[in-house]
Amino acid sequence: MHERLLTAAIEYDKGDPKRIQHFIKVHSFARLIGKQEKLSDEMMKALETAAILHDIGIHEGERLYGRNDGEIQQKLGLVIAKEILESVGGYEDVAERVTHLIARHHTYTDIDGKDLQILIELSLIHISEPTRLLSIS
């Protein structure tokens, strides 16, 4: 279902395997947890889509402002996500919710749905990801 979107996101983040691996992990866990929580089909589609695109504003934030904190990700990410969703097509039914989720995935108050709760928690996955490989002799 999301193959074209995944391909577009991989192309957008080309040259940044850390970001690509992160959104693939977040998407995989979002799909698993969403199914376990028995989310509706529409909510699943929005959650999975937002999981793929949730950090899409990072590169633009670094380019424009020299930073990529949550505020920047939320602000720039929703604009870039809209463009990608329009170019890929097939997401008109969830585009508004997806951009809402992206615009709030670093806002930890007023959580308005299970999809947002799941995305917020999963976006924290990167905290436990190693930033470099260590050699143990």
List each model region and its residues.
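Helix-adjacent hinge/juxtasegments
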Residues: 59-96
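Histidine/acidic-rich helix-loop-helix segments that form or flank divalent-metal centers
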Residues: 90-128
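An amphipathic alpha-helix signature
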Residues: 2-6, 27, 74-78, 82, ...
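Single conserved hydrophobic/aromatic residue that forms the stacking wall/gate
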Residues: 126-137
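Histidine-centered active-site/metal-ligand motif
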Residues: 22, 54, 73, 105-106, ...
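Alpha-helical phosphate/pyrophosphate-handling elements in metalloenzyme active cores
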Residues: 16-47, 82-88
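Active-site flanking loop/helix segments enriched in acidic
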Residues: 2-25, 57-67
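His-Asp-centered metal-binding catalytic motifs of divalent-metal-dependent phosphohydrolases/nucleases
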Residues: 44-63, 77, 99-106
